[in-house]
């Protein structure tokens, strides 16, 4: 049995509950009484239902800087052990789910975990600055069993969209999300990469203090405009505009949340597979490129909406 440790919890992120539940199931009484996320209280009973999704792996330990949070996660996700430190957690497990998306704390909290050599999942992206990203690159390298992802890329909606778009002429793509660019851009970018590849030549953020409006220019002429504003209502997702056809809406947070939950389950299955085989589901180069596109969006906004040419931006990053 593969033993997994989970690290949580930051404000606005319920992944320690939902990711752990894929492996362990959940206690519905504690879920309804103690979980602070209404959507999780809805989709776990409706679409997980305490079925077994992964038979040969369990979350056996949890750590959170706030003891009360760790205890709550443990009760809801049936985790038998609460670690008193990251070191205690990492020593007791075979692999680590780092389920925090306060990206500015990623290196400070998780950097030491890479010394263990154990498989690691990092929520969404690695870093919020080029300096921290370089630290992760130096600590991990292309052969480390590392997965960073949003589950949108693993949603059944993406496979449906691939089939639907196979005979279409795509004109442009629009993406909408709540929250902030550095945290939620990976949701939209991961799905874009699956559908249209990652050959992005320029990034421009024309947003303002209220949010981000980021245009991604593909080498083939495709443009994707991603709008991320805190407080925007659901659904989060992409809309693909086609020549002579109705737009195709691809919802991450679909109306019933069934496909949303299934995307999480599939992502955890692929993490489990990486732990066993050592083979990452996403190439190292793509993991780093996605993070650098996030950084380019930040850089563009800081420079008043300047168009960032990715070739020169990547050269500067590598210097």
Regions found by a protein language model. Give the residues of each.
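Beta-loop-alpha module in the N-terminal Rossmann-like domain of NAD(P)-dependent dehydrogenases
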Residues: 66-68, 72-138
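Glycine/Thr-rich phosphate-binding loops of Rossmann-like dinucleotide-binding domains
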Residues: 14, 106-107, 156
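Glycine-centered short loops/turns at secondary-structure junctions
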Residues: 117, 143, 304-305
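Rossmann-like dinucleotide-binding domain that binds NAD(P)(H)
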Residues: 171-235, 285-292
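C-terminal helix-rich "cap/oligomerization" subdomain common to oxidoreductases
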Residues: 47-50, 88, 92-101, 274-319
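N-terminal Rossmann-like dinucleotide-binding module
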Residues: 1-72, 152
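C-terminal substrate-binding/catalytic lobe of Rossmann-fold NAD(P)-dependent oxidoreductases
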Residues: 210-271
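A contiguous active-site-proximal alpha/beta segment in oxidoreductase catalytic domains
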Residues: 121-185
């Amino acid at each position: 049995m593969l033993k997994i440790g989970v690290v949580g919890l930051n404000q606005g992120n319920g992944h320690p509950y939902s990711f752990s539940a894929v492996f362990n199931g959940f206690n519905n009484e504690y879920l309804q009484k103690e979980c602070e996320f209404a959507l999780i209280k809805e989709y776990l009973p409706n679409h997980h239902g305490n079925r077994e999704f992964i038979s040969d792996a369990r979350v056996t330990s949890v750590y959170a800087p706030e003891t009360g949070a760790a205890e709550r996660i443990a009760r809801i996700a049936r985790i038998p052990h609460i670690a008193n430190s990251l070191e205690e957690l990492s020593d007791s497990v075979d692999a680590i789910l780092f389920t925090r998306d306060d990206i500015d704390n990623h290196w400070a909290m998780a950097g030491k975990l890479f010394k263990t050599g154990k498989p690691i999942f990092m929520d969404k992206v690695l870093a919020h600055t080029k300096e921290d990203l370089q630290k992760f690159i130096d600590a991990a390298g292309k052969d480390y069993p590392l997965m960073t992802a949003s589950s949108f890329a693993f949603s059944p909606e993406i496979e449906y969209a691939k089939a639907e778009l196979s005979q279409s002429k795509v004109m442009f793509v629009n993406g909408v999300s709540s929250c902030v660019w550095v945290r939620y851009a990976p949701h939209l970018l991961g799905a874009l990469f699956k559908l249209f590849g990652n050959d992005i030549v320029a990034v421009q953020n024309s947003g303002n203090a209220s949010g981000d409006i980021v245009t991604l220019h593909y080498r083939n002429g495709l443009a994707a405009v991603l709008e991320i504003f805190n407080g925007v209502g659901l659904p989060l997702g992409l809309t693909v505009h086609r020549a002579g056809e109705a737009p195709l809406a691809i919802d991450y947070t679909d109306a019933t949340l069934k496909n949303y939950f299934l995307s999480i389950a599939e992502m955890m299955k692929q993490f489990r597979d990486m732990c066993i085989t050592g083979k990452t589901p996403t190439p190292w180069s793509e993991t780093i490129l996605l993070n650098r596109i996030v950084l380019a969006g930040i850089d563009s906004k800081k420079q008043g909406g300047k168009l960032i040419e990715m070739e020169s931006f990547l050269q500067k990053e590598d210097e």
